[in-house]
Structures are given as structure tokens and as C-alpha cells.
Amino acid sequence: MTDRTCLSIVLAAGEGTRMKSNLPKVLHQVAGLPLVSHVVTAVQGTGKSDIALVVGRGADDVRAAVEKNAGPVSAFEQKERLGTAHAVLAAREAIERGYDDLLIVFGDTPLIEAQSLQKARERLAEGADVVVIGFRPDNPHGYGRLIEKGDKLVAIIEEKEATEEQKQIGFCNGGLMAVRGQHALALLDAVGNDNAKGEYYLTDIVAIAHSKGMNVTAIEVPVDNVIGINNRVELAEAEAIWQQRKRREMMLAGVTLIAPETVFFSHDTLIEADVIVEPNVFFGPRVHVATGALIHSFSHMEGAYVGPKAEIGPFARLRPGANLGEKTKVGNFCEVKNATVHKGAKINHLTYIGDATVGASSNIGAGTITCNYDGYNKYKTVIGENAFIGSNSSLVAPVEIGDNAYIASGSTITDNVPADALAFGRARQETKEGRAKILREKYAAIKAAKTATK
């Protein structure tokens, strides 16, 4: 298989009107990745393949989304909507380059797996000329039926055209197919539009190929592989299936999910073995959690690295650029953004650390914030090793706190603090004996006077 060339035609020109959205359908996301990018990822999982993207509405945006993850692709605009075969032929220029295999896939089927497409390509390598990907739903009503004679596929019959006997067939058309490259254009050009809608249907190439004595066959894949997305309900269903797959994959790889159904991953989440994830945790894009870490409930992460044996949460938020070293702690109601926290440092409660470096073994007290933004620009806070930042401190960047320095609680620090120094940045306390009693009597009298006038 590795020496066979392949062109994958990704049909992504559908209007998607049932999505009720200004966004092209294929750019809606599952697990933080556009539908069409899931499909391209699966295609690339079969081995080296050139990509021909057939686009319509939002063509530039669709192409940009695909290339962000897949690298350069060829894009072809389908200017008229005249059926699936017509859509494939929009990429005629690419097909004419000549390939061993032609994969035809749909940009709105994000759950298709690489192994399913690989299986279709393997059939081509074994001698098939056309391979249709089929499935067996619990209820086949509404789907085109795959009509077989022995191990050969002879036709695809749509539900409305099927006889009662054919409607009993449970093997249905998944829409995706693989075609031997040398026959692709001849088969596609032979498709006519003699039907009620006057459209050119890709499914017709099955009967055409069979009539020419070609080897046409079908393979069966799991039902979820061919689920197409047409509305927001189906989008949510696809998300649920994807998450279920990912949770299983994570647990089989050595990650403990205490309540799997409450944990949500992104398409690129990387979690190493022996990590424990408590209930109700969300992983956004670009998160890597190293071995032995503990993620407590209600934590939200994106664009973050969590080091070995680190502890996060509960109710912690890690934003892009958070880089937490080994055995660090980011506790409840803490937010870390664009900051490196070195080994053993603790940020336990009610704290914001942004655009900062926290040295090894330092302790950040409750309520501490780095004041990193003046409304126009961001500035950096550097905290040395083994520093102690007292509770309710404000560190006004740019500022540096030296190794082993102490910051008194309640301080506002605007100047650099040398190593081993103790810094205060607050008003001196004054205590007035008996004043509280006088104030209580005064305020009670005011309240009583207001009540009497009502």
C-alpha cells in the first residue's frame, strides 16, 4: 500500500442551510476542530495522499481552516450545485494528474476513521475497481440500499426507488467510496442526469462500473463512521460520540477518569499515563498533561502544559501559555496565563498570575495578582526561587522579586525587591481605642431616625 499514490477529494461545497448559520457547515467544530479538518486528518492517516478540496460558500475560509492543520491543499470551486458526481468533477484537473487510488469523502462526516478508509484502499490494491463504504443502521429507512450479488456490488438503490424486497436489505450506502484512478474519469464522465432533479449522482458509477465488467465491491464500517452533520442536533450527537471514543482511548492508555462522561477533551489533548482526572474537567486545544499529575474537578485548561506530579484545581483555569513545572500546585479559583511556574512552586488560592515567571519552591499567597496590563501593553513579573508572596498582594509589572525575598501581606509592589529582602507596600495601621462603640451608636441612631420618618 505504501507505494500507491492517492488523491483524496474532499467534498466541502454544501450550503448547509439546515445549520441556520452564517458559518459554512464544514467549519462548525467537533472537539475544537472543524468538521472538514477531522475528515482530512482521517484521510492523511491512510498514508501519503494529495488533497483536492471542493469548495463553495466561504471557500477561502474553508481552505484556510484545512491548511492550518493539513498543510497546502488544492482547492476547486463548485460553481453550480448539480449533484455529487458533478462536485467530484470540479476537481478534474487534479484527477487528470493520474493516481493509483481516488478516495471520495464528504467534509461533513467528522467521525470517519482512518482504518475505514485504509480498508477501502486495501481493496483497490487487491484488485477492486470501485469500493463503496457501507454500514448497517438499526433502522435502514431513508438510506440507499447496497444491492449485492455474491461478493459483488451491482447497484445502489435509493429508498424511494426500492422494491419492498430491496427495502428489507439492511446494508446501506455510506456515501464515501474509493475508485481505481485509471478508471475514475471514464466512470464520472459516464454519469448522466436523467432523473427528477436533473443532477449527476456519484452513486451511479456503481451500476456503470458493473455494466463494464469491472470489479465493484462494498465494505462495512461502524455506523458512527459515516454520520453526516446537517443540523445542530446532529453536531451535538457527533460531539458526544467523539468524546466517548476519546475517553475510552485515554483510559486504555493509562489515564484515570473518575467520571468519564463528565470530562471533555479537545482533538489534540495529550495526557500521559498515571494522570488522574476528577469529574467535570474541560480540556481545550493544545493541552499536554505529564505523567502523575492530578486534575481536580471543575478545572478548565487550554494552551497549557502541566508538568509531572503537578496538582491543578479544583476550579482552576489555565490559559494559553501556562507552563507548569514538576510538582507545582495551582489551586482553587486561580488563573494562570502566559506564565512559567517552576518546580515545586505553589499558587494555592484566589490568584491571577499572568505574563510572569515564578521560581522554584516559591509560595504565592491567597489573593495575589500580577498587574500586567496598562490598557495598552503587557508587562512581565519575575519572581525568584523560594520567594514568599504574602496574601492579597499586588505586583505591578514590570517588576522583579529576588530569590528568597518576602513580600508582606496586603502589599502593592511597584519597585524591584532584591534577594533575601522583606518588602512592605501598604499604609501603616492605626488603632483608635473605643472608636468602634461610638460608630455603632452613631449608625444605629441614623437608622432609627430613617425608620421613624417612614
Curated annotation (Swiss-Prot):
Gene Ontology BP, a term: peptidoglycan biosynthetic process
GO molecular function terms attached to this record: glucosamine-1-phosphate N-acetyltransferase activity; magnesium ion binding; UDP-N-acetylglucosamine diphosphorylase activity
Swiss-Prot/TrEMBL cofactor(s): Mg(2+)
Cellular component annotations (GO), alphabetically ordered: cytoplasm; membrane
Documented EC number(s): 2.7.7.23, 2.3.1.157
Keyword Membrane in annotation: no
UniProt: UDP-N-acetyl-alpha-D-glucosamine binding residues: 11-14, 25, 78, 83-84, 144, 158, 173, 230, 319, 337, 352, 363
Active site: 349 (proton acceptor)
InterPro entries linked: Bifunctional_GlmU, GlmU-like, GlmU_C_LbH, Hexapep, Hexapep_transf_CS, MobA-like_NTP_Trfase, Nucleotide-diphossugar_trans, Trimer_LpxA-like_sf
Annotated segments matching region Pyrophosphorylase: 1-232
Residues forming coiled coils: none
Cofactor binding note from Swiss-Prot or TrEMBL: Binds 1 Mg(2+) ion per subunit.
Catalytic activities: alpha-D-glucosamine 1-phosphate + acetyl-CoA = N-acetyl-alpha-D-glucosamine 1-phosphate + CoA + H(+); N-acetyl-alpha-D-glucosamine 1-phosphate + UTP + H(+) = UDP-N-acetyl-alpha-D-glucosamine + diphosphate
Xref: PROSITE patterns: HEXAPEP_TRANSFERASES
Keyword annotations from UniProtKB, A to Z: Acyltransferase, Cell shape, Cell wall biogenesis/degradation, Cytoplasm, Magnesium, Metal-binding, Multifunctional enzyme, Nucleotidyltransferase, Peptidoglycan synthesis, Repeat, Transferase
Subunit description: Homotrimer.
Described purpose of this protein according to its UniProt entry: Catalyzes the last two sequential reactions in the de novo biosynthetic pathway for UDP-N-acetylglucosamine (UDP-GlcNAc). The C-terminal domain catalyzes the transfer of acetyl group from acetyl coenzyme A to glucosamine-1-phosphate (GlcN-1-P) to produce N-acetylglucosamine-1-phosphate (GlcNAc-1-P), which is converted into UDP-GlcNAc by the transfer of uridine 5-monophosphate (from uridine 5-triphosphate), a reaction catalyzed by the N-terminal domain.
Full protein name: Bifunctional protein GlmU
